[in-house]
From Swiss-Prot:
Catalyzes the interconversion of L-alanine and D-alanine. May also act on other amino acids. Keywords: Isomerase, Pyridoxal phosphate. SUPFAM superfamilies: Alanine racemase C-terminal domain-like, PLP-binding barrel. One of its GO terms (cellular component) is cytosol. GO terms for molecular function: alanine racemase activity; pyridoxal phosphate binding. The active site is at 34 (proton acceptor), 254 (proton acceptor). It is an enzyme of class 5 (isomerase). HAMAP family: Ala_racemase. The gene is alr. SMART domains: Ala_racemase_C (SM01005). This is Alanine racemase.
Length: 358
């Protein structure tokens, strides 16, 4: 019997991609598959993301993995290249790059490349993480247009800081600034990621860049993906390896952080922080055992966690436990833990078995 297993529903992935296309019908779709496809398996996700027009990654190694497994669609390096030594690799493997700073621009100007590279100029429209500031924009555009190592036309992008907050005034300001700077430009543009394409239709430009929503996880704090019509792609499962009688007043686990208020049965599940399940999960965090919600009871260990099955439980060793998935949204689990579902799905360790269904 396997211990922790992440079951990846590739049919759900395809459903989600089709729904994205329906919601952004006039945009091309750049599927973001960074961080090992948000923990879902880079190669499997790319192979089955048949509705994608291109892929977005964070590291050059991810782009090379995609090329190695036969992906021929465009691939964009979302953080851009890290050093001038990366540029020949981009050319050889037909990888597009973001340019967001002076250092990258100088490397492009000084390089001797066999063919030009497709460049997306990243504009800092208000998030202040990466990108050229508005007052630098025109100078960057002129230098990129003059650079023989840059394929023409130049492309343009930015990123939202608060698109998941509908009442935040920052997003309309970012949209207005980006559109005003790029109005009349010949090159294609991209502004919306998951929250943007769902909540800010005016940000659906020539390209959208869905990430977390593609995997059936919501970018919003007040709605699950299921409530938006999307299907969770990952279900994290394990099983009971012990069912123990615990008396009222007895504690369970390291630090004795949970003390039973009644005679009950406690289930021990074969998963822990060594598998990527957060050690910070507090007492009360929900787990599904045989289809019903039961609370974590006691501190999460490296290889195990414990749940209060209740005094009348009839569960047995070997019974299934679901940590998150179709019937227990990762968003709900994350909220109990005080994190975001992005972190849950991307932090599973190599010890977790990956199982794919088509």
């Amino acid at each position: 019997m396997k211990a922790a297993t992440a079951c990846i529903d590739l049919v759900a992935l395809q459903h989600n991609l089709q729904l994205i296309k329906q919601q952004a019908p006039h945009s091309k779709l750049m599927a973001v598959v960074k961080a090992n496809g948000y923990g879902h398996g880079l190669r499997h996700v790319a192979k089955h993301a048949v509705g994608a027009d291109a892929f977005g990654v964070a590291r050059i190694e991810e782009a090379l993995q995609l090329r190695a497994c036969g992906v021929v669609k465009p691939i964009l390096l979302l953080e851009g290249f890290y050093s001038s030594g990366d540029l020949p690799v981009l050319v050889t493997n037909n990888i597009q790059t973001v340019v967001h700073c002076e250092e990258q621009l100088r490397d492009l100007e000084n390089a001797e490349l066999e063919t030009p590279v497709v460049v997306w100029l990243k504009i800092d429209s208000g998030m202040h993480r990466l990108g050229v500031r508005p007052e630098q924009y025109q100078a960057f555009v002129e230098r990129l247009h003059q650079c023989p190592n840059v394929a023409k036309p130049l492309r343009y992008m930015s990123h939202f800081g608060c698109a998941d907050e509908m009442n935040n005034e920052m997003t309309p300001k970012q949209i207005e600034l980006f559109l005003s700077l790029t109005r009349g430009c010949k090159g294609e543009r991209s502004l919306a990621a998951s929250a943007g394409l769902l909540a800010w239709q005016e940000s659906q430009l020539e390209w959208v860049r869905p990430g977390i929503i593609m995997y059936g996880v919501s970018p919003f704090g007040d709605k699950t993906a299921s409530e938006l019509g999307y299907k969770p792609v990952m279900t994290l499962k394990s099983h009971l390896i012990a069912v123990r009688d615990v008396k009222a007043g007895e504690s369970v686990g390291y630090g004795a952080t949970w003390i039973s208020e009644r005679d009950t049965k406690v289930g021990v599940i074969a998963i822990g922080y060594g598998d990527g399940y957060p050690r910070t999960a507090p007492n009360g965090t929900p787990v599904l055992v045989n289809g019903r919600k039961v609370p974590i009871a006691g501190r999460v260990s490296m290889d195990m966690l414990t749940v209060d099955l209740g005094p009348d439980a009839t569960d047995h060793v070997g019974d299934e436990a679901i940590l998150w998935g179709a019937d227990l949204p990762a968003e709900d689990v994350a909220q109990h833990i005080g994190t975001i579902a992005y972190e849950l799905v991307t932090k599973l360790t190599s010890r977790v078995e990956m199982s794919y269904s088509e």
